[in-house]
Design a protein with these regions (language model features):
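Bacterial lipoprotein signal-peptidase II cleavage site
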Residues: 18-31, 45
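Sec-dependent N-terminal signal peptides of Gram-positive bacterial secreted proteins and lipoproteins
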Residues: 2-24
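Short, glycine-/small- and polar/acidic-enriched structural segments
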Residues: 66, 74-219, 236, 242, ...
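Secondary-structure end/capping motifs
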Residues: 290-364
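Extracellular mucin-like PTS domains
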Residues: 31-77
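Short, solvent-exposed loop/beta-turn-alpha elements that line the ligand-binding surface or hinge
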Residues: 105-113, 263-276, 342-351
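Conserved C-terminal helix/tail region of periplasmic/extracytoplasmic solute-binding proteins
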Residues: 355-382
Length: 382
């Protein structure tokens, strides 16, 4: 219980961008979709690697024997064995990247996995589910993954990066052409004490601007307050995430995207030996689940990558699925998807980018990553 309470408290220091990107500032209720187990026989290669020794033995026997009725029955039992996987994601880009997999899973098991998906409005809905073992895999803010790892003694591992930076500087007008143009300006922003603040401070400092003295940052509690401030300030400048930028532009035709903070971060990292990246979200797994069901985890990664690739290559169709699962409307999703930086990065590249990113946050505020940088076992490398 103490662990769970400390984790929930740590959420105050973790970014809620993933939920905020849902277009309503985290005020909508969680949408849940449950995929029921299919009773039909699945003949995928992943299913044939079923975890039970008894089932594996039956499958091997069936493959070796002639096609008698008993042998066929044994083969069907082995092939039909499924692993139940509970997945949670937040309204926003990380959930957007899953929609093709979610849609496929409604028809039955995918790659030997029987999925239950839950879309949550905020990260504080996800954390207790992971801690209590009710969720096996979850899409969470990148720094929250580190907080979870540190506060559960390594009971969470990161599988992949699924969202790069979604933060943008927007303005009424065209006075901001580079980061240096922000000097002396007022910036409306939300997310103080979490990733947006640390990312903005890093980019400003890297361009010779002191965040404490050279700019004025007016921190708001929600993205919607930033939009309201822009509407009443004809020279207003704000830091907003996608797809909230797209929603704001629909309300204010004069609003212009001035800077992509992901690109500005990359520019500062260009000469680094192992460049990091501005990250928004990752997908994590309970360590115990990964150890017990490695085939299921790897099958999920394969299916999730296919889903991300589909979403990025089929924007219109993906937008319809995004609306189907009540993440954002299809109209907003179709315009925002090209700027949401939905991706799939695993393995050593994931470790390099994420570890560098966490180090930047740690140097500003150790509590933002759970008090310490994660050890190598934090990174799931298959």
């Amino acid at each position: 219980m103490k662990k769970a309470l400390s984790l929930i408290a740590a959420l105050a220091l973790s970014v809620s961008l993933l939920a905020g990107c849902g277009g309503n500032g985290g005020t909508e209720t969680a949408a849940e979709t449950t995929v029921t187990e299919s009773t039909s026989v699945q003949e995928s290669a992943s299913a044939e690697n079923a975890e039970s020794e008894e089932v594996s033995s039956a499958a091997e026997t069936a493959a070796a024997e002639t096609a008698s009725e008993e042998t066929q029955s044994q083969t069907e039992t082995a092939a039909g064995e499924e692993t139940a996987v509970n997945v949670m994601a937040l309204k926003g880009p990380t959930a957007m990247g899953m929609v093709q997999l979610m849609d496929s899973a409604e028809a039955g098991p995918v790659g030997g996995n029987s999925y239950t998906f839950t879309i949550a409005a905020s990260a504080d809905e996800v954390t207790p589910k992971l801690v209590q073992g009710d969720a096996d895999i979850a899409a969470v803010p990148a720094n929250l993954a580190s907080v979870l790892y540190n506060n559960t003694d390594g009971q969470v591992q990161v599988l992949a990066i699924n969202t790069l930076g979604v933060l943008y500087i927007v303005e009424n007008g065209d006075s901001i052409q580079s980061v240096s143009d922000l000097a002396g300006k007022t910036i409306y922003a939300s997310g103080k004490g979490s990733t947006p603040e640390y990312a903005l401070n890093y980019i400003l400092s890297g361009n010779g601007i002191d965040p404490e003295t050279d700019v004025t940052i007016e921190w708001k509690s929600e993205h919607s307050e930033c939009v309201a401030a822009l509407a009443s300030d004809e020279d207003g400048i704000a830091m907003l995430p996608q797809p909230f930028v797209t929603t704001a532009q629909a309300q204010n035709e004069n609003l212009r995207v001035a800077l992509d903070l992901t690109k500005e971060w990359d520019a500062l990292q260009a000469d680094a030996e192992t460049p990091s990246a501005l990250l928004t979200g990752v997908v994590v797994v309970r360590t115990a689940f990964a150890e017990e069901h490695p085939e299921a985890v790897n099958a999920f990664l394969d299916s999730y990558k296919e889903s991300v690739d589909y979403v990025n290559a089929n924007v219109t169709d993906a937008a319809a699925l995004i609306e189907k699962y009540d993440i954002v409307t299809a109209a907003v999703a179709e315009k925002a998807l090209p700027y949401c930086n939905i991706t799939f990065i695993e393995g050593t590249e994931m470790q390099e980018k994420l570890s560098g990113y966490l180090n930047v946050l740690y140097e500003q505020n150790p509590a933002s990553v759970g008090g310490a940088l994660p050890a190598d076992d934090f990174y799931y490398i298959r």
